[in-house]
Structures are given as C-alpha cells and as structure tokens.
C-alpha cells in the first residue's frame, strides 16, 4: 500500500463498513450519523469522542485515498459511503473481518468469529482462519506473537501501519471484565439505536 491511515481515518472507515452491513436503511451516512457511529460505546476499542471536524477531516483524507465518496442527491444533507471493499475487491468474509479489526483492534480467531456475526456468519473457526490467511497474503493483516496471559495468538490489521506488541501480561480477569463491558455497552447501544429509529419514524409523520 502506498498510503497509511491514522486513527480517525481507520475508525471512520470501519464505522462506514459496519453500518453499510448492519443498518443499510440508514446508509450512505450523514456526517452527524457517522460521528455517532464512531463514538458509540459498543463494538469499539478504544471508545472515542470525535467531533464533526475530526470526522470531516478523516473523510477528506479517505476520499483523497479513494476509500470513500461523498454523495449529494435529492437530500440537502450530503451522505458518505466507503469504497474500500470495492477498491480492493474484497468478499463479504474479508470485509467483515477487516471491519471488526478496524473497530476493535487485535483479536483472536474466536473473538473475530463472534464479533463478525452481525456482518457475516462464519460456519467455523477454520473459515475465519482461512480468511485471515488470504488477507495476510495481500498485506492487510498479520498474526501477532502470543502475549503473556493470552491462550491464543491475536491478529491485527495493518492499514494504520505495523503494530508493536507490548510484553505486559494480560490477565484473564481483564478479559472477563472487558467482556462484561462489551455486553453492557451493546445493550446501551441497542437502546440508543431504538431511540434514533423512533425519532426518524416520528419525523416522517410530522
């Protein structure tokens, strides 16, 4: 690749890919919706608090790299969509894995299988592994050395450059705590999405 993404560009691109798959009725996305998608608490590691300027700048850079486009249709509000999947001719499996790695950082094969389920359902771990191998062949991901405290090796995306692995221990208790936070954040996000859908429904009848 002759380009590299910064943290904001990576989050924006990942959010666009996720919402295209999970909420197609609200895609392409307005700037405001994209800010909310970047900042949501569920399915995000780390959780961020981007403002509109940060997301707008990231979108500009992504457009310059041919990874997103801006649509000005009948609506007065410009919408944004990702071009990453099309640009690199990725299948649904590859797109799902890349999306989750962009949004949640390095993960094990088992974590990826569970977390990609809303985007693409893998039949088994071998399917995830073979997808990762294909992505590794084109330089998009790599397998990290096993860390102290982890039973399995993790995989990382390389769109934002190579990743340095810290040697600190990662106790199992930390993993369990993260899992609990994931469940709570997911419930909070579901409630927030229901509220947004209701507001959209209400505005349609005003």
Swiss-Prot record:
- The molecule here is called UPF0502 protein Acid_1185
Return the InterPro entries for the record: DUF480, WH-like_DNA-bd_sf, WH_DNA-bd_sf
Q: Coiled-coil regions in this chain?
A: none
Q: Which SUPFAM superfamilies does the record associate with it?
A: Winged helix' DNA-binding domain
Family, according to the entry, reads as follows: Belongs to the UPF0502 family.
Q: Which residues cross the membrane?
A: none
């Amino acid at each position: 690749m002759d380009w590299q993404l910064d943290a904001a560009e990576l989050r924006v691109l990942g959010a666009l890919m996720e919402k295209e798959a999970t909420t197609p009725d609200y895609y392409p996305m307005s700037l405001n919706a994209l800010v909310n998608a970047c900042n949501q608490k569920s399915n995000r590691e780390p959780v961020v608090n981007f403002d509109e300027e940060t997301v707008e700048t990231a979108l500009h850079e992504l457009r310059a790299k041919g990874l997103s486009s801006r649509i000005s249709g009948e609506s007065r509000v410009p919408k944004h969509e990702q071009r990453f999947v099309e640009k690199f001719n990725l299948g649904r499996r590859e797109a799902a894995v890349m999306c989750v790695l962009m949004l949640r950082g390095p993960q094990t094969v088992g974590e990826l299988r569970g977390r990609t389920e809303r985007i693409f359902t893998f039949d088994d771990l071998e399917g995830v592994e073979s997808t990762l191998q294909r992505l590794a062949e084109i330089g998009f991901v790599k397998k990290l050395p096993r860390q102290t405290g982890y039973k399995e090796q993790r995989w990382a995306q390389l769109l934002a450059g190579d990743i340095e692995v810290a040697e600190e221990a990662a106790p199992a208790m930390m993993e369990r705590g993260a899992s609990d936070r994931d469940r709570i954040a997911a419930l909070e996000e579901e409630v927030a999405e229901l509220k947004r859908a209701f507001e959209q429904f209400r505005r349609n009848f005003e």
